[in-house]
């Protein structure tokens, strides 16, 4: 296990005490809000640090008691009984503190752009893409997040060939970022008379929603084209050109949006373009740290098959962490916290292992 950064822990405690004192001194409303934000950010780790210091002090007292020949038998027996429990508590607190002190992903607190595209499997793949979108939509509803569809191309038999949406709320990206990759489904299509199991797939991409401050797009770097917009099946064709296609000339990225309002379409398309460019920057930075990427959950490659949904067996398998659960019906209703938590725990464990390697 990696060693605890004692100096950093002391600095956090010192800063926490300073914030408490300044908040008690009655600062202005603006200053108080900033202090309260930093206080709430530091409080979880400082409370663990203080619990760790208390437990290590207790352990030191027990060690001194056991080393003292003058300690009577009853006290020695009690100390030997308590020692393993306190050692276990110290070890658990060490790991909790290390996790809390891991470098934060700057994008974790952001909202996200969710993109789902039907892959191999024709109509069944489009239906599965629709099922995945509803799964994430229900998960978001349970978290109090807001989902807004930016663009959608419906499948001929239902579902979606492609759907792009924003998922807005605090910490959305931190919970959904491990969903990127190929999701494979095995089930009997409703149109399959022989009862044969078909395999199809959909690709999910989760991007942190970028703000103007994150990425600068120069007007001379984009080309905006307007087109006629149509509804599902070609119906409700607008009489004006409202669909917008934006091409980012330096990268060749193309984004379209086809709602009724041209102004809204341009804003939505720019929102997606900004997030894709921001994601490209993050991917580039990650590839420069390629030596570390072996320690992350999967490779982050969106062509990587990450998960299989087997409907006949009610089984879900996440191939990155060898997780298998048999409650697929509940998963499809949006109950994916168990999977997300397992992926996050695996990621944190790998980061701790990497930290330990660097210290050795």
UniProtKB/Swiss-Prot annotation:
Molecular function per GO: translation release factor activity, codon specific
Superkingdom classification of source: Bacteria
Modifications the protein undergoes after translation, according to the UniProt entry: Methylated by PrmC. Methylation increases the termination efficiency of RF1.
Q: Which SMART domains match?
A: PCRF
Any stretches that span the bilayer, and where are they? none
At which residues is N5-methylglutamine found? 235
Give a GO cellular-component term: cytoplasm
Arranged from A to Z, the UniProt key words for this protein are:
Cytoplasm, Methylation, Protein biosynthesis
| Residues annotated as signal peptide | none
Role this protein plays: Peptide chain release factor 1 directs the termination of translation in response to the peptide chain termination codons UAG and UAA.
* Alphabetical list of HAMAP family matching this protein: Rel_fac_1
In Swiss-Prot or TrEMBL terms, this protein is called Peptide chain release factor 1
